[in-house]
Amino acid sequence: MTHATDLALYHFDTCPYCFRVRRALGKLGVEVELRNIYGDPRHLRDLIDARGIKTVPVLRIQHENGPDEWLGESGDIVAYLQKRFAK
């Protein structure tokens, strides 16, 4: 299992699009921090502050030398994960 410390997935448990991303993470053997927007109000506030909306899933990518990237849309997130982690 690979733990990607630069990634965090903003989600909620019953969201089908979030499930799609979590399933892809499992298939790729990648662990990321899961931030449930309804389980912790700080996560919801961070998401709204960054994107202006609370739509999930969103993958927060923390770049070493630059601003964080907030990637939305489950298909785009899965494509990013496959490109980065597929063997």
Where are the regions that the model predicts?
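GST-like domain detector, emphasizing the conserved glutathione-binding G-site
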Residues: 2-13, 19-87
